[in-house]
Each structure stands twice: as structure tokens, then as C-alpha cells.
Regions:
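Gram-negative outer-membrane beta-barrel transporters
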Residues: 1-68
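Residue-level detector of the transmembrane beta-barrel scaffold of outer-membrane proteins
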Residues: 2-6, 44, 53-55, 91, ...
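Extracellular loop and loop/strand-boundary signature of outer-membrane beta-barrel proteins
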Residues: 26-32, 73-80, 129-134
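Residue-level preference for alpha-helix termini and adjacent loops
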Residues: 29, 81-86, 108-109
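Residues that define the transmembrane beta-barrel architecture of outer-membrane proteins
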Residues: 37-41, 84-88, 138-142
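Generic long, charged, amphipathic alpha-helical segments
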Residues: 58-60, 67-91
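C-terminal beta-signal and adjacent terminal beta-strands/loops
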Residues: 60-67, 93-150
């Protein structure tokens, strides 16, 4: 068989060093610098042997912070920090007649969701999970796929 291992890592650090007066409020500067996790990684294992194959992918998102935006004081004094998360995806496939492939899999198979939204106004407006989450809030997604190569 053949095993491919791939690791990718992002280190993000945004620093706004100069803001023209009254261009944006301090809360927006805070959000631009902190709403993206400082670290995120993807580790993928892709195995194939003959007609069978499979993929396991582990996604990591570091914690991130945000302000209430329009609903806060605007000076960056009120912030919320949301925790880090690990998501796992899995997929298996079988190829036959050298052109048809049947695949089953799942994304976020442990049904992880972002932390609950801390801002009361956004919660009142219907936001259950952090609206600035770096990943979706719909939980697990399962699928089956049939494909053909011509």
C-alpha cells in the first residue's frame, strides 16, 4: 500500500501599527488583530492499496478573541475569548472497473461546534454559536458519493 502524510500549519499574527484618526474604532482594530486563531494546523493521512483507500484528517484551530462589534462600547474594552477546537474528518473509497469509485465519509465526525456566543445582543438576535468562528457551526456532515471517470 501507499501512505501519504501531510502536515500544514498556519501561524497568524496581525498587528495594526497605524490608524488614521477616526478611520475605525479601537474595537475594530482589536477584531482585525484577534479574530483569526494565531495557530491552525491540518494533519492528513491518505492510504491506498489496490482498489481501496481512505483518508483521515485532523484539523486544529487555536483560540481566538473578538469584541461585540456594533453592540459594544467601541473602545475594545469588552472582549470574548473562544476556546481551541480539534475536528476530525474520515473517508473511505473503493474503485472498480478502473473508472467507478464509491466513497463514504464524514466531516467533523465527533460533531464539534464552536463555543456558545457570549454576546447577549447577538444571542437575542439568534446567534447560538460564536459568529466569528473559524469553522462552521453545523456539526457533523456525513456523505456518500459515486463517481465515474470517462
Amino acid at each position: 500500500g501507499n501512505l501519504m502524510v501531510d502536515w500544514r500549519h498556519n501561524y497568524n499574527q496581525q498587528d495594526i501599527s497605524d490608524v488614521k484618526s477616526n478611520a475605525i474604532v479601537d474595537a475594530r482594530v482589536f477584531d482585525l488583530e484577534n479574530q483569526v486563531p494565531e495557530n491552525s494546523s491540518v494533519l492528513t493521512f491518505d492510504y491506498s492499496k489496490d482498489s481501496f483507500g481512505g483518508v483521515v484528517r485532523v484539523n486544529y484551530y487555536d483560540e481566538w478573541s473578538t469584541t461585540p462589534g456594533l453592540f459594544g462600547p467601541g473602545d475594545g474594552s469588552v472582549t470574548d475569548t473562544y476556546g481551541s477546537t480539534i475536528l476530525v474528518d474520515i473517508e473511505a473509497h473503493y474503485t472498480f472497473d478502473d473508472r467507478y469509485t464509491i466513497t463514504i465519509g464524514g466531516e467533523n465526525i465527533f460533531d464539534e461546534t464552536p463555543d456558545k456566543e457570549n454576546d447577549g445582543t447577538l444571542g437575542f438576535l439568534g446567534a447560538v454559536y460564536a459568529v466569528t468562528s473559524p469553522f462552521g457551526f453545523n456539526g457533523a456532515f456525513w456523505y456518500a458519493r459515486v463517481s465515474a471517470s470517462f
